[in-house]
Amino acid sequence: MNKLFRSPAVDWPFKFAQKLERARDERLKHFYSQPLPAPDTPLSEVMFLAVDFETTGLNPNKDGIITIGLVPFTLNRIYLRQAKHWTLRPKQKLEEESVVIHGITHNDIIDAPDLSEVLGEILESMAGHIPVVHYRRIERDFLDNALKVRLGEGIEFPVLDTLEIESQIQNKLAGGLWNKLKGKKPASVRLGQSRRRYHLPDYTPHHALTDAIATAELLQAQIAHHFDSEMPLKSFWL
């Protein structure tokens, strides 16, 4: 399926250079000043960073980030000793529905820092890496909006989206006239269901660090099963 995946043609190094010129916050300036891998870098040579957020809801304009999990990895190794996890105190009230999903209560966040207090550490961990997420509108949109609220300026960064990759794979596998006549539909691309197709173990969901590790393992499996690890980074980043 090497020709399957098509990503938008975004020149991320050029965009970072532009953002560096316009950024006002010193933490953002430092983030944009760190070089990204070249677009033609083979996937096998890229240092990725799996990222997962747990939030108070699904709307980045009115909900907030509660926990962040990060873990660096390559296609051959996950660096668990370098994994990081933060619990944050959101500006928004915790709703009962979200507490049921992620299990984080008011007592868990009462003494937690605001995102602004640990932003430098988070951006330092992300700098120079290529984030990998499962559904980019959570991690990218929530962080962008959170920074706009706190700094008056947002953030942009490239990602590999394992949900988007899996969606394209499943659409391809369910395509064709014969499958249409049989009524075959693309399989679910939720994180847990996607992992099971690659015989990856079930993890308890909705913990930011666990889900970040699960996402890293999923990308490794997707590339191993469907793509050539020497394909260029620019074929996948969004």
Predicted regions and their residues:
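Acidic two-metal-ion nuclease catalytic site recognized across multiple nuclease folds
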Residues: 1-38, 168, 197, 216-238
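Conserved non-catalytic scaffold segment of RNase H-like nuclease domains
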Residues: 15, 19-51, 55-150, 156, ...
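Ser/Thr-centric signal marking residues that sit
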Residues: 53-56, 162, 215
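Short Asp/Glu-rich motifs
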Residues: 118, 214-215
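Short, acidic/small-residue loops that bind anionic groups at enzyme active sites
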Residues: 155-162
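Short alpha-helix plus adjacent loop in nuclease-associated cores
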Residues: 162-182
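Short, conserved phosphate/pyrophosphate- and ester-handling motifs at nucleotide-, phospho-/glycolipid
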Residues: 211
